[in-house]
């Protein structure tokens, strides 16, 4: 069985958020860099830095701080997976919480959000939901 890098990112961020840890260490690949860049741009994480440890590159992400213990939990859900790929055209991309959340897609133009896909009128593989 192969590794599902996107599921590993989602699980790492979700577990760090539940345990109220400030930082998440993720293996650096092109896919993870693009997803972390989207999360940074959308405000789900505060900071990202590169880290090298024994010939392996990592991305250390700082999660957004919460003012109270209960608020602002990051919810992530993996949609398309290696055993069941889910594709959508730009007209049928779902809106999460009426547009408050984001959908991350893998398209012919790279990994982008649902808003960018609708503007460029391109569909693709739905990787995950974040709200």
Curated annotation (Swiss-Prot):
Q: Which GO terms describe its cellular component?
A: chloroplast; ribonucleoprotein complex; ribosome
Q: Does the keyword Ribosomal protein apply?
A: yes
> Where is it localised?
Plastid, Chloroplast
* Pfam families, sorted: Ribosomal_S8
Which PROSITE patterns does the UniProt record give?
RIBOSOMAL_S8 (PS00053)
Q: Which GO terms describe its molecular function?
A: rRNA binding; structural constituent of ribosome
Q: Coiled-coil annotation: which residues?
A: none
Q: Name one GO biological process term.
A: translation
> What keywords were assigned to this record?
Chloroplast, Plastid, Ribonucleoprotein, Ribosomal protein, RNA-binding, rRNA-binding
Q: Which SUPFAM superfamilies match?
A: Ribosomal protein S8
Briefly state the protein's biological role: One of the primary rRNA binding proteins, it binds directly to 16S rRNA central domain where it helps coordinate assembly of the platform of the 30S subunit.
Family according to the record: Belongs to the universal ribosomal protein uS8 family.
This one is known as: Small ribosomal subunit protein uS8c
**Which species is listed as the source?**
Phalaenopsis aphrodite subsp. formosana
Q: What is the lineage of its organism?
A: Eukaryota, Viridiplantae, Streptophyta, Embryophyta, Tracheophyta
Query: What gene is this protein translated from?
Result: rps8
